[in-house]
């Protein structure tokens, strides 16, 4: 086995992701070739569509934002050696919390509504994650199975709510009432215009910057705080619970 502590940081943070990306492109090229198309042209279009022009790059960052948030949710649990596969469902319910708070407290000043909405996302998402966490700790249910199942439950619940409960009846499709525009986060188009860059419409907004900030926060939490040390210690050795918790319980 390889001692990860002796592996240079640039190997794990640069070389390994680059190798993984290269292998993914090679496998994709193989299947494209089997399908009878030109792998070079297909991959060229993929790269150009993702990074070749500013609107495409903005869409790439827009879709990346969701993966950053759900990836961070997975990473925190993973440091405890727990596999939280329920990031998708927790994001659904967290988004529901944002909407309910924002729509019901829209009369308050915008900064306060933003703060309350973020708190609503925390509470709703954490409450949804608490159920499989409780089943794991108290009943021994496998957290991978329960979190995956809760993704489907959250998806079905959101469909029901969007169609029958919080739907805007003035709309043909399952849409909620639009939040007041003053509550919307600044868009990438507006941010680019501030720096004199003109682009067409893009769904990317300041939530990407929040995702980057959250990444630094999670890094600091895991590696620079006592709580983070306790999480990592528990993940590597459950006996450490005897020293880090007044009421220890084996999370595995």
Positions of predicted regions on the chain:
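Membrane-interface starts of transmembrane alpha-helices
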Residues: 12-15, 19-20, 109-121, 142-146, ...
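Transmembrane helix-bundle core of multi-pass membrane transporters
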Residues: 54, 143, 147, 151-222
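Single transmembrane alpha-helix segments in multi-pass membrane proteins
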Residues: 30-35, 45-105, 122-141
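Single conserved hydrophobic/aromatic residue that forms the stacking wall/gate
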Residues: 243-252
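Membrane-interfacial amphipathic/re-entrant helices at transmembrane-helix boundaries
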Residues: 2-69, 111, 116
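Generic alpha-helical transmembrane segments of integral inner-membrane proteins
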Residues: 18, 22, 26, 30, ...
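Hydrophobic/aromatic residues within transmembrane alpha-helices
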Residues: 38, 240-241
């Amino acid at each position: 086995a390889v001692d990860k502590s002796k592996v240079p940081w640039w190997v794990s943070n640069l070389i390994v992701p680059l190798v993984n990306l290269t292998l993914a492109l090679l496998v994709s090229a193989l299947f494209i070739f089997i399908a009878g198309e030109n792998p070079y042209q297909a991959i060229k279009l993929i790269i150009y569509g993702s990074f070749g022009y500013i609107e495409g790059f903005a869409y790439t960052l827009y879709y990346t934002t969701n993966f950053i948030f759900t990836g961070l949710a997975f990473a925190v649990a993973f440091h405890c050696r727990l596999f939280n596969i329920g990031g998708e469902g927790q994001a659904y319910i967290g988004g529901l919390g944002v909407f309910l708070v924002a729509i019901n407290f829209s009369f308050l000043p915008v900064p306060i509504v933003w703060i309350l909405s973020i708190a609503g996302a925390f509470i709703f998402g954490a409450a949804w994650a608490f159920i499989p966490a409780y089943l794991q700790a108290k009943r021994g249910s496998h957290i991978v199975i329960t979190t995956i199942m809760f993704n489907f439950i959250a998806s079905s619940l959101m469909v029901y709510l969007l169609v029958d409960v919080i739907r805007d009846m003035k709309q043909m499709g399952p849409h909620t009432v639009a939040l007041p525009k003053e509550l919307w986060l600044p868009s990438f188009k507006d941010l680019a215009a501030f720096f004199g860059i003109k682009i067409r419409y893009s769904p990317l907004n300041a939530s990407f910057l929040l995702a980057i900030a959250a990444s630094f926060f999670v890094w600091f939490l895991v590696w620079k705080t006592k709580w983070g040390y306790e999480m990592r210690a528990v993940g590597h050795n459950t006996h450490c619970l005897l020293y880090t918790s007044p009421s220890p319980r084996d999370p595995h």
